[in-house]
Design a protein with these regions (language model features):
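Short, intrinsically disordered terminal segments enriched in charged and Pro/Gly residues
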Residues: 1-20, 112-124
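Short metal-coordination and nucleic-acid-contact micro-motifs, chiefly zinc-binding Cys/His arrays
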Residues: 16-22, 86-89
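Short recognition patches in nucleic-acid-associated and regulatory proteins
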Residues: 1-8, 18-81
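Short, compact, well-ordered microdomains
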Residues: 78-124
Length: 124
């Protein structure tokens, strides 16, 4: 069974890894905001820790930006009940344990895997 993580569990994971320095394997992914994963990086190199997806939940597109940020902002809050976090998985680097949020954007003719380094200060 896939573990559904609560806000509290996500915060615990983020706090326990907040001082981890990225290794050579994952340093290209260490962006404070969402980035598209390069086709050269195999996301399966990241260990699955859990998901923020609620099984059977309706797809929602509303985002949470009370301070005028947007999806791509490095200061955008991590609000697990809002898009894209409610469709994200939590993964860690198998070499250094750095933690990331990961989701796949499904466009009409493409798939875009996106990743963001998990910052405990931004979890709301």
């Amino acid at each position: 069974m896939i573990p559904k993580l609560s806000r509290h569990q996500l915060l615990d994971i983020a706090m326990s890894r907040k001082d981890v320095q990225p290794c050579e394997e994952c340093v290209p992914l260490c962006c404070p905001g969402w980035i598209s994963v390069s086709g050269y990086f195999d996301v399966r190199k990241l260990k699955f820790l859990g998901t923020l997806k609620a099984k059977g939940a309706e797809e929602r597109w509303d985002e949470y930006h009370p301070n005028g940020t947007n999806l791509w902002s490095v200061e955008a809050p991590i609000a697990i009940d809002h898009h894209p976090y409610d469709r994200s998985d939590v993964r860690e680097c198998t070499h250094c344990t750095r933690v990331f949020l990961h989701y796949t954007e499904y466009g009409g003719y493409y798939l875009d895997e996106r990743i963001r380094a998990l910052n405990p200060k931004l979890i709301v």
